[in-house]
Amino acid sequence: MLRDLFVKKKKYAAIPSEQVRKDVPDGVMTKCPKCKKIMYTKEVLKNLKVCVNCGYHHPMNAWERLDSILDEGSFREYDKEMVSLNPLEFPNYEEKLESDRKKTELNEAVVTGEGTIDDMLVVVAVMDSRFRMGSMGSVVGEKIARAVEKAYDLQVPFIIFTASGGARMQEGILSLMQMAKTSVALKKHSNAGGLFISVMTHPTTGGVSASFASLGDYNLAEPGALIGFAGRRVIEQTVREKLPEDFQTAEFLLEHGQLDAVVHRDDMRESLRKILEVHQGGEMAVWQS
């Protein structure tokens, strides 16, 4: 014991017990993946899920997105009960679909319907990346095509918010067919004088970026959104060149003429309202059957 008085004891960092770590319930705090700042989740939600420190746009689910742009209580959903099957009998596909349905409380990776922005009627589709990474299968393509056709019938603008990893591999060619189907529906809408606004959010890639996401009369994007067809590494290996650091970001695409504007989430509803207001009357009122 006397020896202990003259020996410097090593100091160790105290590791909190499992019970102490559980004192902070899940979901109370949110860590920004960009600036690493830890904030109260309620502050992030209050700011439309935009980091108050660096402006990083956290992903929004479909319902959060609809609430942020439409007049309160105006949304009426289309085709809610449509669900994907497994036509190619892809192993474990049904289980993955069911898991995502329980996790997201959605039947598929897109929510479609109609609502108003400042009392102006629009048909809207919002992709939700929580469901199979927002991938486009036969039901996603069908719901979007039907929504476009509804906009055509109602003679109102169509708005889509994209967030997708591309075509859904478990549905093979049936998934790839949706690229053509949605594009044809949009062409019909456009030929009749219909307005189409595409808003690309993080990420918008693969077959979605190569089809309806890029066909808007106005192509908008959120800051920092990843937008592209093939992945960065695949392109670098193919062209044998190092790509710019900001390659495939919304800002890069805007600089190179592929977007009309990069719009902060705080300004999105007002930007859409202004576009809709500009297109009221005039040639927009002339529809061809």
Swiss-Prot record:
Source organism of this protein record: Bacillus anthracis
Listed cofactors: Zn(2+)
EC number(s) recorded for this UniProt protein: 2.1.3.15
Protein name (record): Acetyl-coenzyme A carboxylase carboxyl transferase subunit beta
One Gene Ontology cellular component annotation held by this UniProt entry: acetyl-CoA carboxylase complex
Family membership: Belongs to the AccD/PCCB family.
Alphabetic keyword roster: ATP-binding, Cytoplasm, Fatty acid biosynthesis, Fatty acid metabolism, Lipid biosynthesis, Lipid metabolism, Metal-binding, Nucleotide-binding, Transferase, Zinc, Zinc-finger
Assembly behavior: Acetyl-CoA carboxylase is a heterohexamer composed of biotin carboxyl carrier protein (AccB), biotin carboxylase (AccC) and two subunits each of ACCase subunit alpha (AccA) and ACCase subunit beta (AccD).
Zinc finger region(s), C4-type: 32-54
Function: Component of the acetyl coenzyme A carboxylase (ACC) complex. Biotin carboxylase (BC) catalyzes the carboxylation of biotin on its carrier protein (BCCP) and then the CO(2) group is transferred by the transcarboxylase to acetyl-CoA to form malonyl-CoA.
Record field: catalytic activity: N(6)-carboxybiotinyl-L-lysyl-[protein] + acetyl-CoA = N(6)-biotinyl-L-lysyl-[protein] + malonyl-CoA
Domain CoA carboxyltransferase N-terminal: 28-289
Residues at which Zn(2+) binds: 32, 35, 51, 54
